[in-house]
Curated annotation (Swiss-Prot):
Protein name: Purine nucleoside phosphorylase DeoD-type
Reaction it catalyzes: a purine D-ribonucleoside + phosphate = a purine nucleobase + alpha-D-ribose 1-phosphate; a purine 2'-deoxy-D-ribonucleoside + phosphate = a purine nucleobase + 2-deoxy-alpha-D-ribose 1-phosphate
InterPro entries the UniProt entry points to: DeoD-type, Nucleoside_phosphorylase_CS, Nucleoside_phosphorylase_d, Nucleoside_phosphorylase_sf
HAMAP family, per database record: Pur_nucleosid_phosp
Residues carrying the site annotation Important for catalytic activity: 218
Length: 239
C-alpha cells in the first residue's frame, strides 16, 4: 500500500534496494545496470525503479539529502514494502591526504553530529555500524573487480556548509575516510526496524586539496561503486 512518500504496492520493490541521494543517479543506475526496468515511485520526484541484475531482482531509489530525508524513505521501504537490505551508494568528501578523488569507501561505521540516533536510543550513544556480512561481501566484490576500496568510518554531517573548519582536523586525527550526510541515520533506521544496511561512497571532492568532480560526473561516472554494490548482493545470496 502506498505511503505519503512512496506510491508503490507491496511487491513492487525487491528485498534489496540501492539508494543514491540523487534521484537522477537512481535513474542512471537503473538504465545502465538493470534489465526489465520499471518505475515504481515518482512522488516528489524521488524516482524509484525495480529490475534485474544478472537475473536477480533489485531495486534502486533516491533518498534525498541529509538524515531526515533518507530516514523517511528507508523507514517506509522497510516497514511498508518488506525491504530487508539497504545499500546507500553515494558521494563523500575526503579529509585525509591518503584518500584520493574517486576512491571507493566502504562505510564500516558512521560518526555523526546529528542527534537523531540519540533520540531513538533514549539519549545514549548508538554505535552506528553496517551489517558485517554486507561489509564482507562488498570487500570481496571489490577485490574480485580489482578495485582497491577503503574500509573504515564515515562522518555523517547535518550541515553541508559547516562553519567549524577545525572539526576536519579532528576527523583526520580519528581516521575518518569520508564526510557525507546520511550513513549514520540509515544505520540507525536499519537497527530500529530489524533490517540490514551498508554505505558505499565514492570520493567526489577533497576538502584539503579542493579537488572536486562535476555534478555530471557524480551522476554518471561512479560505476565502480555501483558494480561493487550489485556484485555484493549476488555474493550475499550465495552465503
Amino acid at each position: 500500500m502506498a505511503t505519503p512518500h512512496i506510491n508503490a504496492e507491496m511487491g513492487d520493490f525487491a528485498d534489496v534496494v540501492l539508494m543514491p541521494g540523487d534521484p537522477l543517479r537512481a535513474k542512471h543506475i537503473a538504465e545502465t545496470f538493470l534489465e526489465d526496468v520499471r518505475e515504481v515511485n515518482n512522488v516528489r520526484g524521488m524516482l524509484g525503479f525495480t529490475g534485474t541484475y544478472k537475473g536477480r531482482k533489485i531495486s534502486v531509489m533516491g533518498h534525498g539529502m541529509g538524515i531526515p530525508s533518507c530516514s523517511i524513505y528507508t523507514k517506509e521501504l522497510i516497514t511498508d514494502f518488506g525491504v530487508k537490505k539497504i545499500i546507500r551508494v553515494g558521494s563523500c568528501g575526503a579529509v585525509r591526504n591518503d584518500v584520493k578523488l574517486r576512491d571507493v569507501v566502504i562505510g564500516m561505521g558512521a560518526c555523526t553530529d546529528s542527534k537523531v540516533n540519540r533520540i531513538r536510543f533514549k539519549d545514549h550513544d548508538f554505535a552506528a555500524i553496517a551489517d558485517f556480512d554486507m561489509v564482507r561481501n562488498a570487500v570481496d566484490a571489490a577485490k574480485a573487480l580489482g578495485v582497491d576500496a577503503r574500509v573504515g568510518n564515515l562522518f555523517s554531517a547535518d550541515l553541508f556548509y559547516s562553519p567549524d573548519g577545525e572539526m576536519f582536523d579532528v576527523m583526520e586525527k580519528y581516521g575518518i575516510l569520508g564526510v557525507e550526510m546520511e550513513a549514520a541515520g540509515i544505520y540507525g533506521v536499519a537497527a530500529e526496524f530489524g533490517a540490514k544496511a551498508l554505505t558505499i561512497c565514492t570520493v567526489s571532492d577533497h576538502i584539503r586539496t579542493h579537488e572536486q568532480t562535476t555534478a555530471a560526473e557524480r551522476q554518471t561516472t561512479f560505476n565502480d561503486m555501483i558494480k561493487i554494490a550489485l556484485e555484493s548482493v549476488l555474493l550475499g545470496d550465495k552465503a
